[in-house]
Amino acid sequence: MGSQRIVNRKILLSDKENNFLGIIQIVIWRVDDDENYPCGIKYRIVFAKRVGEDKFDGDFLRYDNEKWKGPHIHRKGKEYPYEFKDIESLIDDFLKDLGDLLGLNIDEILERG
């Protein structure tokens, strides 16, 4: 399996009062000839929510397509199926979902990133 990382970005997210909320990490690879990733893309997009001074909840919101499970979402400790369309839709879906969970709109999330 050959792969090439095409996106690797971390965004520190704060609220309007500049209180640190957590970290968004987006990692996307282009994958060649792998039956586990028929779309040719492997991805992991995570919002690790700050739950204490030095503690983070990595299952607050995570979109990934782990090879054994396929595309799915981890939201507040529960798992849901996800239909992958393309990279742009993936990121848009994640940001909308995150905005809904945090009570922010997508523009506010991007503005703070």
Placement of each model-derived feature along the sequence:
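Short, compact, well-ordered microdomains
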Residues: K76-I109
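The feature represents the first ordered module of a protein
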Residues: M1-P71
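Intrinsically disordered, low-complexity charged/polar segments
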Residues: E111-G113
